[in-house]
Amino acid sequence: VKAIAGRQLASGEMTSVLSAVSANPVEHGEVFTRRWIVDLILDLAGFTADRDLATLVAVEPACGGGAFLAAMAGRVSASCRKHDRSILDAKSALRAFDLLGPSVAASRTLVRNVLTDDGWSLPEASELAQAWVQQGDFLLDPQPPVNVDFVVGNPPYVRLEDVPADRMLAYRAACPTMTGRSDLYVGFYERGLKSLRPGGVLAFICADRWMRNQYGRHLRELVSSSYSVDLTISMHDVDAFEEQVSAYPAITVLRRAAQGASTVVDTRRSFGPQDAPELVESIRANAPTAVSSGSFTAARLTHWFTGEGPWPTGSPSRLALIESLNDRFPLLEDRSTGTRVGIGVATGADKVFVTKYADVEPRRLLPLSMVRDTASGKFEWSGHYLVNPWDEDGVLVDLSWLPRLRAYYERHAVALKRRHVAGRRPGQWYRTIDRVDPALVDRPKLLFPDMKSAIHPVLDAGGYYPHHNLYYIVSDVWDLRVLGGLLLSGVAQAFVEAYAVRMRGGTLRFQAQYLRRIRVPRPGSISLDDRAALATAFDARDSQAATEAALRVYGIEAMGDLFGGPAAGRGGS
């Protein structure tokens, strides 16, 4: 294992030293895709019998029982008939991999049956079955496919930590995007994408977690740098597999090309084989506006979202709106306006540092704003203080000059010294984890509780320092009541909903990383009337009035029906 981790293995050496694999398909994340879903994916990828498929190359990286392979073989057969070819002309048209010998044997039998049923001879069918299907690990193949036209399939859904240690290390060495607590399918995306020729297409049905979570960031960065996201189809409620799965699946169609327009589709539970042709036709038509049927909705974006950050989620119309706002407006956190998003002070020992009374020098008690102080929508201080070890210059105080503070900390020395921050800096055992910024205390700030169902900005006019369960916004230019009105609106809520993880009960995390995603107009571009309307709505905690004013400010009055969620109703939460 250490040898694998410590050096790059030669291609053949890598697989020969690895642990034997289980013959149980379930342990390999094998879930069978329904035939109509397979046909939908092949249609969307452009792997269709009207093309001369014998001249192209398609890869199925984890063929399992052959759900995709059978359909692909049938299409190659039909294509050869249509183009007056021998089926043997297609000997290089398909390459399928699987780790398990029984799956390889089953797939070869399936291919033979498909081809003989189509009228090809048994020797021809057997030759192609042998050529098309091979036992091997797609992620570690010493001669990986290159310059292929299609990579299609349903890659295995297995946590990387559930793979034997030596094989896991080999996967990480072969696939740099597989970081953190990655799932195995991330490697299939990476290897599949890198196999494509210019213009080649990858089409997978797979869990959609990688689009938003931390371990998918390097894959998102790879896609953004060299590939085009042509299509995403959310299939959360669709019966796409032969058995129930816990993951939320999506179909993604990626192309080795510069990013162009992208289509986003959301399906409903009723979406089935009868609806697939209509969906394919609407996508091929490149409709510039949103399309809606009884079983799906679709919208066309002018481009996809870039970088390694989480890709937004939501209805196609919501995503189209967010894409438009991203293009037209600057980010909330903006150096040109001195607008900054931050988090309150973390102590590592709130029972010691956060109190309503402590026998210390009075100047060491810093008024602290808490989540409960924001509950009503008006800032109402609950009387909590931070027993503050930092002076007015942000330097740790010398306890020899503060006997009462020293005595207080020493009474709690056991709790303070067992914190990680104290272990790293024994001479500063009484520090908080975060340094206090003295300049922040008297600044007006908008406060945001960490967890809430709807966005909940509250104005602290100054004099308090935020606790770590509060995020804050300060600005050199914005009137914070006007900005507070914008951030109380359904537009701001839509940004957070698109990027944040929603917890049980509908609670959202209003963390700095999500608040920074919000786009806002330039302060000077807002009319006096709209400034007054936003400030009045903020003071009244009227999120519906705030949303109405925000729609005008953003120039999206016609899209008010997209904001029927929690932030669109009267009052805060």
Residue ranges and their predicted role:
Residues V26-E27, V31-L40, C63-A70, L99-V104, ...:
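Signature of N6-adenine DNA methyltransferases within the class I
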Residues H303, P310-T536, S543-A545:
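Polybasic, glycine- and aromatic-enriched phosphate-binding surface used to engage nucleic acids
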Residues S489, I526-S573:
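Amphipathic alpha-helical coiled-coil/heptad-repeat segments
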Residues V1-P25:
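A short N-terminal interaction module
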Residues L53-A54, D89-L94, L128-A129, V133, ...:
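Short, well-ordered loop/turn elements at secondary-structure boundaries
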Residues R75-S79, V111-V114, R167-Y171, L219-L222, ...:
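Glycine-rich, phosphate-binding/catalytic loops in enzymes
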Residues E27, T33-P142, C206-R209, L219-R220:
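Conserved S-adenosyl-L-methionine
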